[in-house]
Amino acid sequence: MRPLQERIINELKVKPEINAEEEIRRSVDFLKDYLKKHPFLKALVLGISGGQDSTLAGKLSQMAISELREETGDDAYQFIAVRLPYGDQADEQDAMDAIEFMQADKTVRVNIKQAADAMVQSIEENGLEISDFNKGNIKARERMIAQYGIAGAVSGAVVGTDHAAEAITGFYTKYGDGGADITPLWRLDKRQGRAMLELLNAPEHLYKKVPTADLEEDRPALPDEVALGVTYNDIDDYLEGKEVADNVAEKIENWFLKTEHKRHMPINVYDTFWK
């Protein structure tokens, strides 16, 4: 095993193999324990895209909330699934299929187009140019603003979808989809999350769907694997301690090192990771 590979695996807490049933229970109990420790919190809030990660995180969240209501008799507990399209979303049906699968207590829809466009316009009025890529990050941050607004209105915590295969590459927007209160998928790679959805009898098209952030207008629905230049299968193999081709390992490690700042709170004078 490569030295950096071992360090990454230890940092991200990835197991070479999992028992899907045990990991489902672990995530559900983790969410329940967090809410019980913070009795002022009565809701879990999560943006639903219709992809594998939000489908799994949403199902686990609803399971945790349902169990809490039954165990405590407190009907105030709720899970809120949030649709956050930018205008019209091409895969809207997938998102609705995911919400139906998780049987969300409540669905809220917030179209972020007006807010995102207004932000871009306001910045560009100052003589600055916002690239399409930069605008994509603005969209992601507007989505998180909406989720925290909803969570604030219902005494809730925002659930994140970050997992090991995403964390290793930093393939998320800093303070956008990378910002959340609690991340029940942390420690899992992509294939492990898929195994959990299979066990939960999720609709197959939701976890076999080609992963995409779909933030760029110049390159709509750009597959993650194209953007990264590496497949999730290779990333998962690397995270599980398996041997991958040197050029693949180098690309994964380059992403990890380049995006290290995303896995830290704002840098302070005592931080040394960046030196």
From Swiss-Prot:
Role, per record: Catalyzes the ATP-dependent amidation of deamido-NAD to form NAD. Uses ammonia as a nitrogen source.
Catalytic activity: deamido-NAD(+) + NH4(+) + ATP = AMP + diphosphate + NAD(+) + H(+)
Keywords on record: ATP-binding, Ligase, Magnesium, Metal-binding, NAD, Nucleotide-binding
Protein name: NH(3)-dependent NAD(+) synthetase
Single Gene Ontology MF annotation: NAD+ synthase activity
Binding sites annotated in the UniProt record for Mg(2+): 53, 166
EC number: 6.3.1.5
GO cellular component term, pick one: cytoplasm
The keyword NAD belongs to this UniProt entry's keyword annotation: yes
